[in-house]
Amino acid sequence: MLPSIAKHAALHQVNPLKKHGQNFIFDSSLCDKIVRASNLAENSRVLEIGPGTGGLTRSILQKNPESLTVIETDARCLPLLNEIKEYYPNLNIIKQDALKINLTDLSYDIVNSVGFAYKKREVKPITNRRANDIGESKSIDYKVTIISNLPYHIGTELVIRWLKEARLITSMTLMLQKEVVERICAIPSTKAYGRLSVICQLIAKVEKCFDVAPTAFYPPPKVYSAIVKLIPLENPPSIALINKVEQITKLAFAGRRKMIKSSLKNLVPNIYEVLTQLKINDNYRAENLAPQDYLRIAEIL
C-alpha cells in the first residue's frame, strides 16, 4: 500500500524547488475534485505535465484510464513515480522538459513505444507538415485527455501550444494562476478580456470550474489558483487563421485604449472599409470586439 502523498514525498526527500516552479498538493481530496471536474471517462488516454509528488497522478489512476503518461523534468521525483507505477502498470513516465515536447510527436511515440493502446497501427502519424488545420483528422486514434497542475511560469505558453494541436486532444482540465483562468474565460468589454481570451475561445469551449486557495499547496504561493476546463471545438479555425488572429490581437491589445481603426491601420490599410463591410463599429476598442469579430477580420486579410 502506498503511503500518503506527503509521507511519500518525505520518504524520498523531495522538497519543492523554486527553479521548477513547484508547489506541491498533498490533499488527495482536492486531487480527486480536479479529476471529477475533468469528467474523465474510463479507458481514456491521459497526459499529465509535472506530476511532482504524484498526488494528482494517483487520483487519475484511480479512475482506471487506459494509460496515463506523465512528463516530469525533476529527476528527484522519478523514484517516487516509479513506486506508484508498481501499483499501476498503466503509468508511463517520461523525463523531459514539457516545453521541448511536441504533442503530435509525443502522441505517436507514446502509441508505438511507451504504452498507449493503438488499435489501428496502419494509420500513419500526423506530422507538422500535414497538420495544417487545428481540427483536421477527426479519425485520429490516439487523442489524449490532459489533466495537469501546470507551473505558473509555463502554463499560458503550454495552453496556446496545445490548442494549436487540438485535433489530438479530447479535453484539458488545468490548474493555473487564477488571473490566467479569468483571462481565458473573460467576455468582451471586461478588464480581463484580451488576446488569451480570444485565442482560447476560438478553438475551445472554456469553463472555469473552481478556485483553489494558496493554503492548498506546499509551500503556499502568493496568489490564488483556479481550475479551467477546455474542450476543443468540433470545427475550429485553421492554424493559418489562428496565426493571423494572433497577429491582429497583438496589435489591437497593445494599444488597448485605442480605437481599433487606429491600432490596426498599419496592418490593415483599408481598415475603415473592412470594419464597414463586417458591420463592426469603427469606434470600438480592442476589448469590445468578440472573438468571432477578430476571426472575421483575419478571414479578410
Swiss-Prot record:
PROSITE patterns given in the database record: RRNA_A_DIMETH (PS01131), SAM_RNA_A_N6_MT (PS51689)
Top-level taxon: Bacteria
UniProt enzyme class: transferase
Molecular function per GO: 16S rRNA (adenine(1518)-N(6)/adenine(1519)-N(6))-dimethyltransferase activity; RNA binding
A GO cellular component entry from the record: cytoplasm
Annotated catalysed reactions: adenosine(1518)/adenosine(1519) in 16S rRNA + 4 S-adenosyl-L-methionine = N(6)-dimethyladenosine(1518)/N(6)-dimethyladenosine(1519) in 16S rRNA + 4 S-adenosyl-L-homocysteine + 4 H(+)
One Pfam family named in its UniProt record: RrnaAD
Compartments where found: Cytoplasm
EC number, UniProt record: 2.1.1.182
CDD domains: AdoMet_MTases
Primary localization: cytoplasm
Sequence similarity: Belongs to the class I-like SAM-binding methyltransferase superfamily. rRNA adenine N(6)-methyltransferase family. RsmA subfamily.
Protein name, per record: Ribosomal RNA small subunit methyltransferase A
Gene coding for it: rsmA
